[in-house]
Amino acid sequence: MEQFLLSVGLLVCLVCLVKCVRFSRYLFLSFCKALPGSFLRSMGQWAVITGAGDGIGKAYSFELARHGLNVVLISRTLEKLQVISEEIERTTGSRVKVVQADFTREDIYDHIEEQLKGLEIGVLVNNVGMLPNLLPSHFLSTSGESQSVIHCNITSVVKMTQLVLKHMESRRRGLILNISSGVGVRPWPLYSLYSASKAFVCTFSKALNVEYRDKGIIIQVLTPYSVSTPMTKYLNTSRVTKTADEFVKESLKYVTIGAETCGCLAHEILAIILNLIPSRIFYSSTTQRFLLKQFSDYLKSNISNR
């Protein structure tokens, strides 16, 4: 019995040590300059960004272009993409290709594949997604959009990865960034469908990373919490709530840190705090009522009127 307890104690100490080492790497990288553009350019000439018309996708489009990559912008609204395309070309000198596609539909991927043909794609950012309810809501009150959420949040990641990964494999290099969410790390009641869809992205990404990391391909899932974007109704920014530009610039520092990252130091600290709460307590009725009130009040008081 004594030997067993000693083994358990050593295992716990080892887990804590690994977490401390990982967090120290975050601290170090957070104070470093951004990843050299040469690293991203070594992956290939082009970056493909889904959901590039707004928010995090738009920010990735500009930032990757600043690092010297040509960019393919894919989103639903052509007018937005054309404006962004002109600004990227004017300010960075990178080439831009625009592809109009509605990711809530299934019949778009042959068209996208045709548009990507012949491009040396080194970076794929699977960013497109939809949140059926910003304020906490029961599943049946949002289930009318369930098929659109599945297509946009899950099917898009699978299909776009299929289109691009096979070419990365043949060149033995590439970077795929899949944007999940902090609410995909553990089940979140009142965001059930969104949480489940983002959990798929987490599991899919981490499994793929194991399959393809020995082939020179980095596949990383990002699990941010609060980012001020059109999808979150432009939440007021703070030390925790980042602008899309802030989040993207910091996230690119961590592309070599491992298969999963929150994307910024503030969210990593928040994740550590949340993970300290035992599931039995987190999912208790009392805790859920408390979180529901606190989170609803926070959202209502911080949603911008932009």
UniProtKB/Swiss-Prot annotation:
Compartmental location: Endoplasmic reticulum
Active site residues per record: 194 (proton acceptor)
Sites where the protein binds NADP(+): 44-73
Pathway this chain belongs to: Hormone biosynthesis; testosterone biosynthesis; Steroid metabolism
Catalyzed reactions: a 17beta-hydroxy steroid + NADP(+) = a 17-oxo steroid + NADPH + H(+); testosterone + NADP(+) = androst-4-ene-3,17-dione + NADPH + H(+); 17beta-estradiol + NADP(+) = estrone + NADPH + H(+); 3beta-hydroxyandrost-5-en-17-one + NADPH + H(+) = androst-5-en-3beta,17beta-diol + NADP(+)
Keyword Lipid biosynthesis assigned: yes
GO CC entries: endoplasmic reticulum; endoplasmic reticulum membrane
Residues given in the record as substrate binding sites: 181
GO molecular-function term, one example from the UniProt record: testosterone 17-beta-dehydrogenase (NADP+) activity
Enzyme Commission no: 1.1.1.62, 1.1.1.64
Keywords: Endoplasmic reticulum, Lipid biosynthesis, Lipid metabolism, NADP, Oxidoreductase, Steroid biosynthesis
Any one Gene Ontology BP term: response to nutrient levels
First-listed, main subcellular location of the protein, grouped into a coarse class: endoplasmic reticulum
A Pfam cross-reference name: adh_short
Family stated for the protein in its record: Belongs to the short-chain dehydrogenases/reductases (SDR) family. 17-beta-HSD 3 subfamily.
Function (record text): Catalyzes the conversion of 17-oxosteroids to 17beta-hydroxysteroids. Favors the reduction of androstenedione to testosterone. Testosterone is the key androgen driving male development and function. Uses NADPH while the two other EDH17B enzymes use NADH.
Protein name per UniProt: 17-beta-hydroxysteroid dehydrogenase type 3
Organism ancestry: Eukaryota, Metazoa, Chordata, Craniata, Vertebrata
Gene behind the chain: Hsd17b3
